[in-house]
Amino acid sequence: MKKNKLALALIISGLCAAGTANAANDRYIIQVDNNKKGVVKALAKKLGGDIKVDGNGFIAAQFSGHDLASVKGLLNNPHIKLIEEDQKRVPMALYNDDAGNAMQQQLTPYAVYQSQADQVTFDANAGMKVCVIDSGLDASNPDFIWGNITGDNDSGTGNWFDNGGPHGTHVAGTIGAADNNVGVVGMAPGVAMHIIKVFNAEGWGYSSDLAHAADLCSQA
């Protein structure tokens, strides 16, 4: 294997981390052992609580008009471990590409912000190579330094430099698009890349092809 190689797997998703807002509608989480939950549920209902969730080791109940201190007083019971506000959770903010026309100016892809790659400095002399296993790379795209790019073909999907759908070019661009005042600029502009085309135009590939691609990456 060559020195200082880097194989990257990028997973850009819309999964959300939790942020907090205010407690929702006087709703509280009550932690309690499962074998004592029946007693606590009965007490909560007796005191005006509306059971919303019956979970493993806890219940969530709404006590209209009661703040946290008053609910703790109402449920002064040895079986209860903890009472806390049932916080609303909101998704982590999604990042967008810079506003503008990529044909007229250079934009930064949203994933650069999402991964916080814009907060670190890229060392162009580090001897780094990134292997991208995806749907190929569009050879007609001028936003890459093609002298820094190699690839391997796949028997099922064809040449790595034939675009098998936009995803591979998008991912490769997010990683290494050139800093050339047009299109997009990647996390590591102009970085050496090795492209392996596994996913077809329908967006899928075989597990065996993916495993083989990983081996090819280690040899690139």
Model-assigned labels for residue ranges:
Residues 2-22:
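Gram-negative bacterial Sec-dependent N-terminal signal peptides
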Residues 32-107:
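Autoinhibitory propeptides
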Residues 102-192, 209-212, 216-220:
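Active-site core segment of subtilase-fold serine proteases
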